[in-house]
């Protein structure tokens, strides 16, 4: 089922999400719906707060990039209760966008190597070091779980330059090709 994506201005996007337990109701269905919603909206990542749930669940698919990056073939993964333990490596600037910020794309600096702990869909714990593009996507999505958005990493000048677009979202007038839940 395709779910509406919550747009900038929705309070859930600024809340710190809670860890969940294996007893969380209908988790497999939720994860399937998150993948379907993300792919339908042409995203590579989706955090549960973006569909209105303040819980620590993220889905990432890099498969759409596999034509240029064969190592991403069939990469579809859910992360439960993820936490970044360490950010390192070279700081790299790259343009980012966000399904909760339709029409906004800005350059963001992030470390290109992270250590992350998370659980998979079977609640098996993992501790991994991740580099490159996946490290960036993880940082972006995991920020959502801490009530942050990529625009929080922008300079005051860049934030001022996108203020008009943000105000449009705050008025509930954002436009996109996918189903959204806007501020009323």
From Swiss-Prot:
Active site: 141
Record-linked InterPro entries: Peptide_deformylase (IPR023635), Peptide_deformylase_sf (IPR036821)
Gene Ontology biological-process entries: co-translational protein modification; translation
Sites where the protein binds Fe cation: 98, 140, 144
Keywords recorded for this protein, A-Z: Hydrolase, Iron, Metal-binding, Protein biosynthesis
Gene Ontology terms, MF aspect: metal ion binding; peptide deformylase activity
Textual note on the cofactor: Binds 1 Fe(2+) ion.
E.C. number(s) listed in UniProt: 3.5.1.88
Record's catalysed reaction(s): N-terminal N-formyl-L-methionyl-[peptide] + H2O = N-terminal L-methionyl-[peptide] + formate
Necessary cofactors: Fe(2+)
Family: Belongs to the polypeptide deformylase family.
Function: Removes the formyl group from the N-terminal Met of newly synthesized proteins. Requires at least a dipeptide for an efficient rate of reaction. N-terminal L-methionine is a prerequisite for activity but the enzyme has broad specificity at other positions.
Xref: PANTHER family: PEPTIDE DEFORMYLASE (PTHR10458:SF22)
Protein name: Peptide deformylase
Organism, as annotated: Bacteroides thetaiotaomicron (strain ATCC 29148 / DSM 2079 / JCM 5827 / CCUG 10774 / NCTC 10582 / VPI-5482 / E50)
Protein's gene: def
């Amino acid at each position: 089922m395709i779910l509406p994506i919550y747009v900038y201005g929705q309070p859930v996007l600024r809340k710190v999400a809670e860890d969940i337990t294996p007893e969380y109701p209908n988790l497999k269905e939720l994860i399937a719906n998150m993948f379907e919603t993300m792919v339908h909206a042409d995203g590579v990542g989706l955090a549960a707060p973006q569909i209105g749930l303040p819980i620590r669940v993220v889905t990432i698919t890099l498969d759409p990039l596999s034509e240029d990056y064969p190592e991403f073939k069939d990469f579809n993964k859910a992360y439960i209760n993820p936490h970044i333990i360490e950010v390192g490596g070279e700081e790299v600037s790259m343009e980012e966008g966000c399904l909760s910020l339709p029409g906004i794309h800005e350059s963001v600096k992030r470390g290109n190597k992270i250590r992350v702990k998370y659980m998979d869909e079977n609640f098996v714990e993992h501790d991994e070091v991740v580099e490159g593009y996946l490290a960036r996507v993880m940082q972006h999505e995991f920020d959502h779980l801490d009530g942050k958005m990529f625009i929080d990493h922008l300079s005051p000048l860049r934030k001022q330059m996108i203020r008009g677009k943000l105000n449009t979202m705050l008025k509930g007038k954002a436009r996109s090709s996918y189903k959204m839940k806007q501020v009323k």
